[in-house]
Amino acid sequence: MSDVKILLVDDEKPFVETRMKRLKKRGIEVVPAYDGLEALDCLEKNSGIDVVILDIKMPNMDGMTALKEIKSKFPLVEVIMLTGHATIETGIEGMKMGAFDYLMKPYDTEELIVKVNEAAKRKRDQEEKIMEARIQAITLRRH
């Protein structure tokens, strides 16, 4: 899928920089953030973000708290949780809170790209359904 824009959130700057380079080579636009608070700020300032890649353990605002805020304020944005020191159960808990999926660190870039594309497609499908419902509602009001 082309024209995918993601927000990559992790407090490990070298990790973010390495992943950004790899994702950009694959045509994915990447906006970096280094904690949950910065992620929320980026979502408010950057339109068109399809997917958030969100680390769980971060300073200022951890990933689980950020996930709750993101899904509350930006319900259509899909979130993929990253678990390093956390457990699989933490990743599953994130999915119960609304995350699209999770990945265990270290993970394969190809696996991440597949999940990002699937999540972006789901977001765009949801946006399309909402638009169709709005058009239908307007059409019904006119008749």
Model-derived features: where do they sit?
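Helix N-cap/capping motif at the beta->alpha junctions
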Residues: 32-41, 63
